[in-house]
Amino acid sequence: MNYDKLFQNVINNKLTDLELVLTDPENNNLVLNLHKIVLDINCPYFETLFSNNFIDSNMKKLNLFVEDSYITRDIIYNFYGQTNRSTDYPDWLYQLKKIKCQNFLCMKPDFYRLSDFVFDKDNFDELLNTIDSIGYDDKVVSLIFKNMPVDYDLVKFPIELLNRMLDVSGFYIMYYDNNRFSMYNQYCEFVVFDGISDFDYSPNSQIIYVPNSQEIVYVSEKIVVFNIETQISRITDSINPVSSKNYPTLCPDQEHIIYYNNKWDAICKFNVKTMKLIGTWRASNGSEINMDENNGTYFFDSIGCKIVFSPSGDKFVLITDGIICYDVKTIKVCWRFNKIVPLSRVDLGYVPTCIRDVMYSLCRKYIFYLTKYGLFVINSSNGHLVSEMKVRGISICHITCDIVAILTYDNSGIIMYDYQNNMIISELNFSDNICFGGESKICMNYFDGKLFIIGSNNTNRIDYNYIINISDFTYEKNFTEKIDKSYYVCDNDIIKYNNCCNNCFNIVTDFKSVLRDKIKNHIESIN
C-alpha cells in the first residue's frame, strides 16, 4: 500500500468519510479528515465503535476528549505510515502522554519505550501517575523500582506491589553497549546511565556495581566512575599500563576496589570516592612496591586470574595457577594453595585456560576452586585440600548450602554436585550440539529459583541462551540470530546474550540495595 498517497488524501480531504475533532484539557482543538476503514483496521477503539450499533458508529463527525490532541493526532497519522512528532515535549514526557493516549484508544501502551529514559526525582510522580492509570505487570513493576527515589514515601504503595518489587528486582545483568550502561533480567531491560561521551571503551575492560552509592566502576587503562542517580561521571588519569584484564573486585567497605595489574604482578587498591590509588603490593609475597620504580615482569599468568573476598570481608584470595590468601588490611599472605593437578595426575584434555571459576561456600568454610584439571574443595581458613572431583568445568554457582551446579565442557551440560558427600547427584546434558565458550557463566537467581547460563552457543554459529528450572530440571531454549552487536536480543525478552568477545558485563544481585532494605523494613513494620 502507498501510505504516502493515502496520507495525502487525508491532507486533501479526498475520499474521507469521517471528520474527527480532538480536544484536550489545554483546549487544543484539531480537526482531522480520515478514513473509517484505516481507523478500524489499526485501532481497537474505532474497531469497536464502527462494528457495533453505537450511536456514533454511523456519524460523519465525531468529537473525542483526549489526554493530548497533538499526540493523539501523531498516533492516528502513524496508521497512515507517518512518524512525525508534533510537540516539543521532552522525550520522557512525550512518551508518558503517548501511553495515556494509547490507553484511551484501547491500544497496547508502549510501556517498554520508557526503559530508554532515566527518570529523576522531579518526574518520577509523572511516571507513577501514568502507570497507575493503566495497570501493572512485572516489567512495569521493574521499571517503577528502577526509577524510584530512595527517599520516596512508600505509604503510597500497596503492600502487594512492594512485595512484587522485591521479587522482580533481585537479579540483573549489567552491560555496556552503544555509549550507555543498561541492565536486564527476565522481566525487563532499562538504561541506567545514558549519553556517555569522551569515553574510550576497551574490550578488555570490566565493570563493578557499587550498591550503596549507586555507581558503576569501569576499570581498564583508566578508571571511570558513573553515578546512576546524578548521571555524572568522573575519571582518573591513566594509572594501569596493562594490555589485558584487571579482574577488579569491590571491597566490603564499598569505597575501594582491588584489582590485579598483570604488567607488574601487582595487587592494586583504589579509592572510588577520592579517585586515588591507595597502594600496590607484589602479588607473589604481599610486599608493598612503588609502581613508578618497578621494571620487572609479571610472575603469574593472568589468564583466568580472579580476586574474591571472603564472606566476612577480612580476607581475599587471588587465584591464578594457585591460590594466595591475603589479609585485607595489611595485604600480607595468610596461606597458599599451589596444587592444581589431581591425585590421578590425569590431564582431562584441552580447556582454553587453566583457571575457570572460584567462590566461597555458603557456610563460609570452603573455597571452590574450578580448574581444567577438576574441582578442588579447599579449607578457607588454612588452604588445605578437603576433596577434589575430576571435571572439565567452566563456571560454578550455589544451588543450596550443600549442592553446587557446574557448567561443563564434557557433554556440554550441567552437573549437580554434593560436595559434603563428594558425589554427583544429577546431570543435565544438552542435546542441541551446544559448545559452551570460555566466557560462559552459570548463575542462580535465588529470587525465582531459576538457573541462568549466560553466553552459550553452538557449533553451527547459531546462538542459544538457557533458563533452567531447578525444580524439575527442564530447560527453556531461547533462539537468537547472530547480530553485529555486543549482545543478542531474544524475541521473548527472557534474557539477552552477551557476546563472548565482550566481557564488559556484570551480574548484579544488590541493585538499589538501600531501597530494597527500606521496602523490607516498611513491609515488616506493617505486618
UniProtKB/Swiss-Prot annotation:
Record-stated family: Belongs to the mimivirus BTB/WD family.
InterPro entries: BTB/POZ_dom (IPR000210), SKP1/BTB/POZ_sf (IPR011333)
Organism: Acanthamoeba polyphaga mimivirus
Taxonomy of the source species: Viruses, Varidnaviria, Bamfordvirae, Nucleocytoviricota, Megaviricetes
Alphabetized CDD domains for the sequence: BTB_POZ_ZBTB_KLHL-like (cd18186)
Protein name: Putative BTB/POZ domain-containing protein R225
BTB domain boundaries: 16-89
PROSITE patterns on file: BTB
